[in-house]
């Protein structure tokens, strides 16, 4: 048996998934078995490096990673044949999610939508009274939450987005200016003693801690930022973490299934069978129920938060593939904030 190597995020592929999909491959006569590589996905640069070193065959890329940094990852992927007879579950995917420009190459998708979520902030309602729950992103800068909330470290653009929202800009305003190549406006916006940089430094100074691939729960944190999956685990243990529904909305992301460029022939066909399994009803319902994610499939009993907030996936709050210019400007902001931290 040959290996089909999956590169994915923590919690996305269970041992039971592997057993089931390997049974399907055997029953269909494929000479392939899947395994999940030990390296877990963390961020765009790390995923690019693992794919470039040819350490995986099927990936679970966050959509906007595909065209980040001069579209470097897109060059390592192949378009999905959405009419493949092996992708029988594709028709149940939300049509709003199947042809998003940042995942397309010459009108063909480099991705199959899988599931997503938001960069959410969750509050411990065991410790915080209902009337004290924040309502605006701006509240994160209040003294009462100093050292009591956490931020993600690797994907710092979310924190830049929050800062811009807190100053009444669009969260992707930096990218909008960069795409227009409006360097004068960018220079003014990011001036050394300017409002944006100062606000961003305050955010980094006020945080009670950073996390990388999955959020940490420590005694002093009343608010944790999270992609969602860990919240369910805590609440199943008796926790009472609740999404803070910021009036500015939530920055959203979509994770996808992708095939590396070298897959072909029987191996590519086997990869399509695997992808089709991961968009079936059972798996899609599991990511809602167990990971608190937003599913790509519409043919489900519950779509989680989408049942209550149907616009989470259609808003203009899907993180874009940042251009080299805006990305490097944000990196400089982080360096300046870290120097003062």
Language-model regions: role of each:
Residues 266-269, 277-341:
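Extracellular/periplasmic juxtamembrane helices and adjacent flexible linkers that interface
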Residues 120-127, 254-267, 286-290:
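A bilobed periplasmic-binding-protein/Venus flytrap-type ligand-binding module shared by bacterial periplasmic
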Residues 126-135, 168-175, 263-270:
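Short helix-loop capping/hinge motifs at secondary-structure junctions, enriched
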Residues 45, 67-116, 131-136:
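Hinge/lid segment of periplasmic solute-binding proteins
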Residues 78-91, 111, 239-251, 261-263:
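Short beta-strand->loop
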Residues 1-73:
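Early extracytoplasmic/lumenal segment of secretory-pathway proteins
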Residues 148-151, 158-165, 169-242:
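Ligand-binding pocket segment of bilobal, Venus flytrap-like solute-binding proteins
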Residues 5-8, 35-37, 57-61, 113, ...:
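Structural recognition of the beta-strand scaffold that forms the well-ordered cores
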């Amino acid at each position: 048996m040959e290996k089909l190597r999956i590169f994915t995020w923590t919690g996305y592929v269970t041992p039971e998934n592997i057993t089931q999909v390997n049974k399907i491959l055997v029953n269909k006569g494929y000479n392939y078995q899947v395994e999940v590589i030990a390296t877990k996905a963390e961020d765009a640069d790390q995923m690019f490096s693992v794919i470039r070193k040819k350490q995986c065959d099927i990936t679970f890329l966050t959509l906007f990673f595909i065209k980040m940094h001069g579209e470097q990852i897109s060059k390592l992927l192949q378009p999905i044949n959405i009419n493949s007879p092996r992708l029988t579950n594709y028709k149940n995917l939300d049509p709003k999610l199947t042809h998003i420009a940042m995942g397309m190459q010459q009108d063909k998708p480099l991705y199959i939508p899988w599931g997503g979520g938001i960069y959410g902030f969750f509050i411990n309602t065991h410790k915080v009274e209902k009337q004290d729950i924040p309502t605006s992103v701006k509240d994160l800068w209040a003294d009462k939450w100093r050292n009591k909330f956490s931020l993600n470290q690797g994907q710092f653009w979310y924190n830049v987005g929050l800062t811009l929202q807190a100053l009444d800009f669009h969260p992707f305003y930096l990218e909008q200016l960069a795409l227009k190549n409006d360097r004068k406006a960018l220079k003014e916006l990011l001036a050394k003693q300017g409002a944006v940089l100062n606000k961003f430094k305050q955010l980094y100074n006020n945080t009670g801690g950073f996390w990388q691939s999955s959020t940490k729960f420590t005694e002093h944190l009343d608010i944790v930022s999270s992609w969602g999956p860990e919240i369910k685990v805590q609440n199943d243990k008796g926790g009472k973490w609740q999404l803070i529904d910021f009036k500015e909305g939530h920055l959203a992301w979509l994770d996808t299934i992708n095939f590396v460029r070298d897959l072909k022939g029987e191996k590519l066909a086997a990869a399509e069978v695997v992808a089709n399994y991961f968009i079936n009803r059972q798996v899609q319902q599991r990511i809602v129920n167990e990971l608190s994610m937003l599913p790509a499939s519409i043919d489900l009993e519950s779509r989680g938060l989408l049942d209550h907030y149907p616009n989470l996936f259609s808003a203009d709050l899907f993180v874009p593939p940042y251009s080299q210019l805006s990305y490097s400007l944000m990196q400089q902001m982080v360096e300046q904030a870290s120097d003062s931290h």
